[in-house]
């Protein structure tokens, strides 16, 4: 794939994913609407802004592996109700973040740093979303990926593609706690 995204294919896939967001659960984080799931991945990203698609791509890849995963694109606040119904024990948010690191760098970001120098590439306040998510579970992790570019485009850089694959493998193996902290 090497990060090449086709906007028309993304749109068609998005329709399918929207239909399956609530009903598709499985893998080691199996859940249904009346059962609590262990881990829910919330991917944030804009597929039309190059590397900014990273969080969404991670969510989609993990969904294919059977994880309870939501591709919230750039509107995570719209999925609070869905997340609440899943009753996750832990929420892992994946997003591109400006961290002044080399492109493709992956870091776990302490939630208190979101108010400080850490900025996601979206206009919505991630701190407000996290505050709402804390009402669901206190176990929230933010994984940030340093983008190379967030200019309008449909190509994810090689560095960020590698980071996406690293995060998918790490979460699949249950080793997200081993990611370096910012």
Question: What is each PLM-predicted segment?
Answer:
Residues 2-148, 154-182:
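N-terminal catalytic or cofactor-binding beta/alpha core of small enzyme domains
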């Amino acid at each position: 794939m090497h990060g090449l995204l086709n906007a028309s294919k993304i749109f068609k896939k998005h329709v399918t994913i929207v239909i399956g967001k609530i009903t598709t659960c499985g893998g080691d984080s199996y859940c249904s609407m009346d059962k609590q799931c262990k881990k829910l991945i919330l991917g944030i990203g804009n597929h039309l802004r190059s590397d900014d698609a990273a969080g969404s791509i991670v969510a989609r890849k993990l969904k294919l592996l059977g994880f309870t995963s939501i591709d919230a694109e750039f509107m995570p606040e719209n999925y609070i109700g869905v997340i609440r119904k899943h009753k996750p024990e832990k929420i892992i948010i994946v997003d591109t973040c400006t961290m002044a690191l080399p492109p493709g760098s992956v870091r776990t970001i302490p939630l208190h740093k979101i108010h400080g120098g850490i900025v996601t590439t979206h206009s919505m306040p991630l701190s407000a979303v996290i505050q709402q998510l804390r009402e669901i579970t206190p176990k929230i992790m933010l994984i940030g990926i340093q983008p190379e570019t967030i200019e309008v485009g449909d190509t994810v850089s090689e560095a960020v593609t590698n980071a996406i694959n690293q995060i998918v493998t790490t979460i699949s193996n249950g080793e997200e706690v081993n990611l370096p902290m910012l």
